[in-house]
Amino acid sequence: MTSVTLLHTADMHNRLTAQAAEQLHEIREQNHALLLDSGDAIGALNVTVRRSEPIIELMNISGYTAMAIGNREYFFRKWGMVHKTRAAAFTILSANIQPVRGDMGHIKRWTTVTAPDGSRVGLFGLTPTMIAPGSWVERLSDMRFLPWKQAAQQAVTALRGQVDWVIALSHLGQQRDQRLLELFPQIDVILGGHSHPQITKIEELSGTLTSYPRPYAKEAVLITLGKQQDAIHYDSRVIELL
């Protein structure tokens, strides 16, 4: 049997307080959890780049493991997108954004980590398509969006054989996430964002657990998962943030 504990936030939009950052740090340590975010953490719009993003420093204090690129973290030029999260001491993920040439700096498509309990965890990010293929804006960009289904397939193929858990940090929204879990049952957990639910939603669909916290750093979701052979069981609770 293998198990892992996750602490999940999404769509914080620069609303994380110093108190809440310390609270997340304490919860993460007490529960030996991986702290993960599904994107739109920062305050900048997708068309703007600010000198700094204060929430990134607070997330460093909390001890995040990884976050997905959301539409707020996106910028149509690579330098801007890299700049927005440059201060992160944790991994930034998007499997479906690729550079026209070169690499993406500190931004990765997927990664593997060892959880505090020793289980191996594969993480990948998915970002909503911000520039339509073939559009005039695409000609100005030095990055391209892969179809999210193709990117997810590549990530699952790369990760599944080498980890105990495959976790998608998705900023696609609930409707596309539903399709994601139908297409890729190899994904154990979808930690979602972008949908801004009025009530935090945690449910198991077709054997895949999905989590959607309330936005604006109001709540986080603590999930403990266990796997024995092919059977997965979980326990979850919603935590109100200070």
Task: Please give the residue ranges for each predicted region.
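Acidic, metal/ion-coordinating pockets
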Residues: M1-L242
